[in-house]
Amino acid sequence: MSERLGFYFDQSLCTGCKACQIACKDKHDTPLGVNWRRVVEFSGGSWQVVGDTFSPRVFAYYTSVACNHCEDPICVRVCPTTAMTVRADGTIFVDDSKCVGCRYCEWACPYSAP
């Protein structure tokens, strides 16, 4: 197998703007509703009463999620139509003409990526 590729993501700089998601969609010209990359928000906490004022104890952070092109991808193994394959360069490929949209790949993926 050739050199493996990756997508560099610096979470400390992410503001959740989804520019990476839009750029991926634009680059690959995916149809409406298909996002090969998506930005996920994790947030929580609450406001605390401190004396007679409210004090924020909240957090929010974002992460960019996409296929990690695993060496032994379970998504390829669970696909009932063999729409998902591993190319010679190690990337996972989805053959749209075979895919029936069952989402078994997404359910099996430890990253919920496809």
Which residues does each predicted region cover?
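Non-ligating segments of multi-cofactor redox enzymes
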Residues: 1-114
